[in-house]
């Protein structure tokens, strides 16, 4: 899996919440308590949803200026 390089040394909690045919994936950066959520079809698979949640967390942390 291609984890964004800026997140490699950060502690991130990932949770999955299935809701019918959709799964909500939440990623939270432990140090800053920044949390993001995405949703996708159950058929996408856990790894795909995890990667997309990590990419979104990376984007949000960069936008806030927390990471570069």
PLM features: what roles do these ranges have?
Residues 10-64:
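Amphipathic, hydrophobic secondary-structure cores in small proteins
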Residues 3, 65-68:
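Short acidic DE-rich linear segments
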Residues 1-9:
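Negatively charged, low-complexity tracts enriched in Asp/Glu with abundant Ser/Thr
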